Amino acid sequence: MFEKYLKSAIFLALYPLAMLASNLHEFIALSQNNESYLIKQMQSEQANLDKEQAFRNYLPSLSLSSAYVANNKDRFIIDPQESLFAKVSLNFLLFDGGAREANLRALESREKLSFLDKEQNKNYLALNAITLYFNTLSLEKILLANQQKVSFLKSTFERLQKFYDAGLSSKDELESIKAKYHLSLLELSQNELKLANIQKEIKILSDTDFKVQGNAFLENPQQEKSQNYEVMIAKEQINLAKESVNLAKAEYFPKFYIQDNFNFYKNNYNPKVSAPFANLADQFLEKYSQGNQFILGMEWKIFDFNARAKEVEKERLNVQIANANARFSERKNKEELNYLDKSLKVLQEQILALNLSLNAANLAFESVDKKYQAGLVSYVEYLQALEAKFKAQSDLELAKNEFEITKANYYFNAGIDLNSKVKE
């Protein structure tokens, strides 16, 4: 029975911790469920609906119109006192100079642009999540080092205070250690504020109080083929600009259409004539009528003072602008990836060097600390060794953090799904 209660107690104690257990994959998923991505999804759906709506607008359409008309006071004998009519119209566009096809292709291009924008936003949110994740891990380790530094200085300050009270330590040594101790407290508070700011950004991004845990990392990039979204968007803008030229050219051609109208009338004339003429009026004035009208029509703008030519010229310039923008985006992306690749190599060398520096700083501090406790070195050397030790720790954590975030930026600029490159 005791073992049963013990297991229950352990489960209840560990359950909250299990609920807090998180990883980077989960954080990315949470970040991609926020409002900005949902908006992009809805905008992509809107683009698809625009395309489908335009296609259906070009299909034959059937419309019905109906009305009741009453004429009072003075009216002609041929005007009915009351009239009820209905009209059914069938309309179909046969040819519009290619505008229909160009418009549908343009809407397909807009749909693709909306999709690319959505996917870019999804990867950008993953980049934000990764940046916040590694910034948190790095800052937590730096805070731990800050706390150790505060603890070292506090114990040293308290020991020196006793020596000073006993007349065994100088005033300047005590004040120097005291100042360093309070500066370390300030540094700790500043880093805690930075962590609070990161937690605020996490809340904004994911709408949760996500607790960063684990030691995730990203795969080291190889020579990845770039599928940068900005470049793909710029290239698709060229296709959209070309369709705008086709739409402008279509205005030079005539439009042919078919229209069929079926009309039905029911009239109550009630003519204001004397009785001898009433029967005669009834014979000539139809109370019921119906008819069908078939139209094969054409519309053609023949002259417009070269307004269409100017429109075509303007759209051709837009094609040149889109081409120039695509070339620039491609060159920019290529150079950015080259720079990030070089940065990664330098950061790897930096991490190796900082590891060696940290080992050396730890050994130096251990030696100086023992000598300082024995009174063999001055407090100046002690403070320098202490500062070097914790600076080496902070520098190493910052370099590791920058290395992971630079990898994330490399994948983002290459247009590669960041979530697929995360390793737990």
Task: Place the predicted regions along the sequence by residue.
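Small/polar, glycine/serine/threonine/aspartate-rich low-complexity segments that form flexible
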Residues: 65-93, 103, 259-300, 424
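Periplasmic alpha-helical coiled-coil/stalk elements that build and connect Gram-negative outer-membrane
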Residues: 122-241, 246, 340-343, 347, ...
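A short glycine-centered flexible hinge/capping loop motif at secondary-structure junctions
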Residues: 164-168, 372-376, 413
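Acidic, low-complexity, intrinsically disordered peripheral segments
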Residues: 395-424
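Bacterial Sec-pathway N-terminal export signals of envelope proteins
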Residues: 20-63, 94, 168-170, 206-253, ...
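Hydrophobic h-region of N-terminal signal peptides that target proteins for export
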Residues: 11-21
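A glycine-/polar-enriched beta->alpha junction
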Residues: 30-36, 48-60, 88-106, 116-123, ...
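Bacterial N-terminal signal peptides that target proteins for export
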Residues: 1-13
